[in-house]
């Protein structure tokens, strides 16, 4: 039987909030089977929980935010959510003493490191997957995103940036998903932004934690970071990282093929909600026989070592 996963122990780290620029303490705790992914703000009294849920995603301008019925929000969850998807973690409580998850280095890699450091525990309950049965597509102008049936998890993402630092040959990336491919090819790709946009936002009291330490920063001509890019096509790889985190907002790994052109947080979430709203397009599945599970979701030896 393919089992649900959680952490073996509590793990904690500190970082800086992208929006506030203030120190954030992040604590990740093991959780029982069928808990799901719970984000919790402990800076509020009483603490407020935000279960990962596609319908709770309401603000996607600069990041992915979860917003509850009282309009209380928690921001910048997408990179940590991508790390959870990458390692197939089903049950976890994530606490922060701030209104946002720390940005760390702008990628998912620090979260992957923390989760592996905590260790991953298999529970005695079957892991549920969402299997795509019908093609679902959403559009917004010339942007689009699509999910179709596939026995695994495959992603094909294309961006369209007219910028000297982003060569035309590096604007499309394809991935046959697995924990190994996510960790090696996707998790280290950082978020990116224009220096002029960061300066403007900071003048308005926003993006106060934005810096060269947590993003690829470009001007009109080049990448400004001293250490350059981690991958030649780091920009599109990061957009794929965002999509993996956005699609895992349902709390389940998806068995299907995701294809997108110029998609972002809002369109990724629109696709996820469109899939879930069409009952004939998907089904829950479990695997009693490991041999029948798509290889995409087999845990690498490093996860349970």
UniProtKB/Swiss-Prot annotation:
Its cofactor is Zn(2+). Pathway: Glycolipid biosynthesis; lipid IV(A) biosynthesis; lipid IV(A) from (3R)-3-hydroxytetradecanoyl-[acyl-carrier-protein] and UDP-N-acetyl-alpha-D-glucosamine: step 2/6. Keywords: Hydrolase, Lipid A biosynthesis, Lipid biosynthesis, Lipid metabolism, Metal-binding, Zinc. SUPFAM superfamilies: Ribosomal protein S5 domain 2-like. It comes from the Bacteria. GO terms for molecular function: metal ion binding; UDP-3-O-acyl-N-acetylglucosamine deacetylase activity. GO terms for biological process: lipid A biosynthetic process. It catalyses: a UDP-3-O-[(3R)-3-hydroxyacyl]-N-acetyl-alpha-D-glucosamine + H2O = a UDP-3-O-[(3R)-3-hydroxyacyl]-alpha-D-glucosamine + acetate. InterPro entries: Ribosomal_Su5_D2-typ_SF (IPR020568), UDP-acyl_GlcNac_deAcase (IPR004463), UDP-acyl_GlcNac_deAcase_C (IPR011334), UDP-acyl_N-AcGlcN_deAcase_N (IPR015870). GO terms for cellular component: membrane. Belongs to the LpxC family. PANTHER family: UDP-3-O-ACYL-N-ACETYLGLUCOSAMINE DEACETYLASE 1, MITOCHONDRIAL-RELATED. This is UDP-3-O-acyl-N-acetylglucosamine deacetylase. It comes from Proteus mirabilis (strain HI4320).
């Amino acid at each position: 039987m393919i089992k649900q996963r959680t952490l073996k122990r509590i793990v904690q780290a500190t970082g800086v909030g992208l929006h506030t620029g203030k120190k954030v303490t992040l604590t990740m705790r093991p959780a029982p089977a069928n808990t799901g992914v719970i984000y919790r703000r402990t800076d509020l009294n009483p603490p407020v929980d935000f279960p990962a849920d596609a319908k709770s995603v309401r603000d996607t301008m600069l990041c992915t935010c979860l917003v509850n019925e009282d309009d209380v929000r928690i921001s910048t969850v997408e990179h940590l959510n991508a790390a959870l998807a990458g390692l197939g973690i089903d049950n976890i409580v994530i606490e922060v003493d701030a209104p946002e998850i720390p940005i760390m280095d702008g990628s998912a890699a620090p979260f992957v490191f923390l989760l592996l450091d905590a260790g991953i525990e298999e529970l005695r309950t079957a892991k549920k997957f969402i299997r795509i049965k019908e093609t679902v597509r959403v559009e917004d102008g010339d942007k689009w995103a699509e999910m179709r049936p596939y026995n695994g998890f495959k992603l094909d993402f294309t961006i369209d940036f007219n910028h000297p630092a982003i060569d035309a040959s590096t604007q499309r990336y394809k991935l046959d998903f697995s924990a190994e491919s996510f960790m090696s090819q996707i998790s280290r790709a950082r978020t990116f932004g224009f220096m002029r946009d960061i300066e403007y936002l900071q003048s308005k009291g926003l993006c106060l934690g934005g810096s060269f330490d947590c993003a690829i920063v470009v001007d009109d001509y080049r990448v400004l970071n001293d250490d350059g890019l981690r991958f030649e096509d780091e920009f599109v790889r990061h957009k794929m990282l965002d999509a993996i985190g956005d699609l895992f907002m349902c709390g389940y790994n998806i068995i299907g093929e995701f294809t997108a052109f110029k998609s972002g947080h809002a369109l990724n979430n629109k696709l996820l909600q469109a899939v879930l709203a069409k009952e004939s397009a998907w089904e829950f599945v479990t695997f009693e026989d490991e041999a029948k599970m798509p290889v995409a979701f087999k845990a690498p030896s490093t996860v349970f070592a």
